[in-house]
Amino acid sequence: MVMHDLQEISGYCRASGAHEAGAQDEFWNRVRANIGSFDLREDERLCAIALVKRMFPVVVREALGWEIDTTRWPSTVYIAAVRWIRDVLAKNPSSAERYAKSVHHSVGSSAFTEQSTSFPDIDTGACAGFATLEPNYFHSSFILNSREVALADRQRRELIRELRSLHQAKLDSNTSVGPAPSYYALLLADGDSVGTLVRKYTGDVVAERLAVFASEVPGTVKRHDGVTIYSGGDDVLAMLPVETALKCAEELAEKYREAFSDIPNATLSVSLVFAQIRVPLTAVIEEAHRLLDKDAKESNGRNSLAVAVRNRGGFTCKWVTTWTRKLAGTDTESSSVDLVHGMAKKLSGSSLTSGASTSLVYRLRELISMLTGKSAWSPGDRITLLEELDGVRFIKAEVIRALADDQQDSVDSEELTDLVWNLLQAAPNRKLDSDEPRLARVTIDGLLLARFLATGGREEDR
């Protein structure tokens, strides 16, 4: 019933016997025939409030004369998969068409419900409407769920077989289609100390520059295959695919600085949550706000990026950093986003196999915990490391060990060690807790984030 303490509206009571139960089913089947099975599942019987909320976008024009663009917002599942969809359409259209036809044969036209206009470059009519498929049909876990998809066992097996055939199809000579990504990114941005700027430079001056920034946001997000949910003044809320989210965040910070080019110390902080598509959106939004306010701004001193990876079981990493950081032992500044993407490329299989890259990251986590005497690690931990321990030497030993296990001769161990060490450094905009010069702070979360990015946000789709 969705709202457990309110009565569903058919007027029939299933507990009164088979006749009442049958009449109730018939009532809801007639409702479902008019609105579609994706707006009302087979097992749903709604109360009046829930039905109004569910149907409001559909009937609001007729009832109130309002215009609501219900096609504007793609689902989080579609956002996660949009670049994958584009790749399949461009590089293996025959496989895309075959799968779309298989879904239509098994499920019918009710499976083709995606109407978002956010990606006009994607031809929704191509390949039997592949891009208009309800994007859950790109995931076997959805098809296997009998509550979500009412199919006979034989039809379910056939559809799973067709989906796996799509996964095994080729994008090019070296790359298979693979499963659709199961993660998307929620981005939240906010200007730092705007009130202070207003008091110093007046509201009109600041408002003029905020308007310049806000005008740049939709185009910036769109270039990264994202969707802007809200942009006003210094606030931004957007959804993006995993591959492009970090670079979009970095570009937004640059656009903010450009808009305030004549005002020093005007900076932007951003939080990003890479969320598994089944995690409730409300929980993702709450975490994005907490990351932005508590981690990027309060703990790290603003002008910062805070990133978390959230699967169905909880958080697997929380990485907080300044936008740029000094490379160890030099005065050279490097983009923190470029560093983590560079590490992800090393771990993606182009340099190391999946097993070796995973082994390296988790060995380093265990090594650092052992060196610091920390028995348990939690996402976001910044660990105190004595400089006398010569962390670089220990890390290089683990890198060489991982390369040897992988029988990998083409990777420069010195380069990989430098990349790892630079990514391990905590990068705050304010002093850490201790002023003791013999102490350094490291965090393993940057490496864990790189390992996640190397997967492209994909999970093994069984």
Annotate each PLM feature.
Residues 1-462:
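Regulatory and interdomain segments flanking nucleotide-handling catalytic cores
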